[in-house]
Amino acid sequence: MNIFEELKARGLVFQTTDEQALVKALTEGQVSYYTGYDPTADSLHLGHLVAILTSRRLQLAGHKPYALVGGATGLIGDPSFKDAERSLQTKETVLEWSDKIKGQLSTFLDFENGDNKAELVNNYDWFSQISFIDFLRDVGKYFTVNYMMSKDSVKKRIETGISYTEFAYQIMQGYDFYELNDKHNVTLQIGGSDQWGNMTAGTELLRKKADKTGHVMTVPLITDSTGKKFGKSEGNAVWLDADKTSPYEMYQFWLNVMDDDAVRFLKIFTFLSLDEIAEIESEFNAARHERLAQKTLAREVVTLVHGEEAYKQALNITEQLFAGNIKNLSANELKQGLSNVPNYHVQSEDSLNLVDMLVTAGISPSKRQAREDVQNGAIYINGDRIQDLDYQLSNDDKIDDQLTVIRRGKKKYAVLTY
């Protein structure tokens, strides 16, 4: 099975320009290719991971990746299938975000070894050197307005309005391809399926300006089995930056993937062989309640993104919280595991009587209910059941001198911080 066949078998090929020519190029020698990442935030997220890992698979097959950080295009904003204009960021912010994204990409691509080691480029380096007049004369003249307006990504915005700034975005992305081909002999661009219009602007410019053929391959935009856009948890993006989405939160995200999606995601997001995945699928289908596919997915992706130690910590947090063993976890681990539960910062004037604190922290709705909860054995401090109505919270209840975990019943948690 050649690399293109494997990508197809994994569900990673959505659309290509001349497929036969692309397969020929990939099987006859080393291809230099690029994927672009606009710094629209200070971190990449799971939605980017499909293209990143596809790039890694091609590198493992001997091809040479260029990771392009859009320091210039990030200042403009991509209109593709967006309902409204993006807010423009300052140059300083975009450059700062660009540096962070460069660091994240080095986790996945090999920038050190071999003749196909990855290269990092930033399109700000060339766009900052081109005057507006030169850009119009040397690039803009190759694009007709009719051609630009025919793109689906633009058509959808004509009704609501699109600025010239965003309208010109596709020409900038097209020029990226031309520049990388001219300087580094890059002949293939990889990106999300929503980028098709911008990406083919690059092949058009190559054909007209340099009489060369470029290839484009898009990866699918991933949705779950209900059609919901993939990569968000509770409406929030799942970030690759551990400070924005902890390894535990990412682990839980994968653990909660639906049965109908789990095996498909193993093919897309892990480097397990297709034969290994077929074995997992067989075991998984025989006992779905054991969630083997989800557990494997969580292990593989968290290890890939954050490392083995982070995976082990996420697994330990999961197991200890499930067993109610709060005291076996550090304050930092508890902050990861209980990041979504109510948090109350204890004030110096607060009563430390347990019944009072249950009401103050919003765990019980009233003192009467709080007393009943304590007497009925429904209240736990750091995993220990407390039935003393006169119990006073003390330093002994502080984990690492930072927090106390209170649980009411089986599932209602609150964290007291000091």
UniProtKB/Swiss-Prot annotation:
User: Where in the numbering of this chain does the S4 RNA-binding domain appear?
Assistant: 352-418
Q: Where is this motif: 'KMSKS' region?
A: 229-233
- Coiled coil region boundaries: none
Binding-site list for ATP? K232
Q: Does the keyword Transmembrane apply?
A: no
| Alphabetized SUPFAM superfamilies for the sequence | Alpha-L RNA-binding motif (SSF55174), Nucleotidylyl transferase (SSF52374)
Gene Ontology molecular-function annotations: ATP binding; RNA binding; tyrosine-tRNA ligase activity
- In UniProt terms, what function does this protein have? Catalyzes the attachment of tyrosine to tRNA(Tyr) in a two-step reaction: tyrosine is first activated by ATP to form Tyr-AMP and then transferred to the acceptor end of tRNA(Tyr).
Describe, as the record does, how this protein assembles with itself and its partners.
Homodimer.
Q: What is this protein's record name? A: Tyrosine--tRNA ligase
